[in-house]
Regions:
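Conserved NAD(P)H cofactor-binding loop of Rossmann-fold oxidoreductase domains
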Residues: 11
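Glyoxalase I/VOC metalloenzyme domain signal
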Residues: 1-7, 18, 25-165, 171-175, ...
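Membrane-anchoring hydrophobic segments
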Residues: 14-15
Length: 202
């Protein structure tokens, strides 16, 4: 077990063609996702696996007001984003969780699978820490970018995540960016290069 404990939630998303296992940490939860059937998300997962193998798939950013997020981001992206309703059933306990989410089109998320989510009903069960060596929190996730200015515009200005550090590192000729949310750092390594703006999770 990578975290020192098992998942507290194992379920499926019939309308999306995927299944998942959730591992709650102090500041977020880590989700393992796999193909379970045919569906729109299953197709995206398969494409990711073919290109990148088993690796970090995407980011889920939580909001307290999905309607306001839709309004503001639709205006920022000059498009009409859609809100979808979701439901999950825990195969371990039969508990249900409900949520509403927005899948951000990749042309706006700059290549990274990103969704905004508002949980509306049900809770993710916590785990009992039986060993002090168990993982308790996620410190940071890393993004590589060829367009740091555009990345700042997306994460700070559009998503509203605090930019805590913006520093040029001469050693490798690029910028180190720290975005902070919920005691978690989204770290970005930005080296300006020609070509279309593109980010990737590392």
């Amino acid at each position: 077990l990578v975290f020192g404990f098992g998942p507290t939630w194992q379920g499926s998303h019939p309308s999306l063609g995927t299944k998942n296992a959730l591992f709650p940490l102090d500041n977020l939860y880590f989700e393992l996702i796999a193909v379970n059937d045919d569906g729109p998300l299953a197709e995206t997962v398969n494409e990711h696996l073919e290109k990148n193998g088993e690796s970090v798939f995407g980011l889920a950013l939580e909001t307290d007001d999905i309607e306001m997020a839709k309004k503001e981001l639709s205006a920022s992206f000059n498009t009409d984003l859609e809100i979808s309703d979701g439901k999950g059933v825990n195969n371990i306990s039969n508990e249900e969780r409900h949520w509403r989410n927005i899948f951000i089109p990749r042309k706006f998320s700059r290549g990274i699978f990103t969704l905004l989510i508002q949980h509306t009903k049900g809770n993710l069960p916590k785990h009992e820490i039986s060993d002090e060596s168990s993982i308790s929190r996620m410190d940071h996730v890393v993004i590589n970018s060829n367009d740091p200015d555009g990345l700042v515009d997306l994460y700070k200005e559009k998503y509203g995540i605090r930019l805590a550090l913006d520093q040029f590192v001469e050693k490798w000729g690029g910028r180190m960016l720290f975005f902070r949310t919920n005691h978690t750092t989204i770290e970005a390594i930005g080296i300006k290069k020609d070509g279309s703006p593109e980010d990737s999770l590392w």
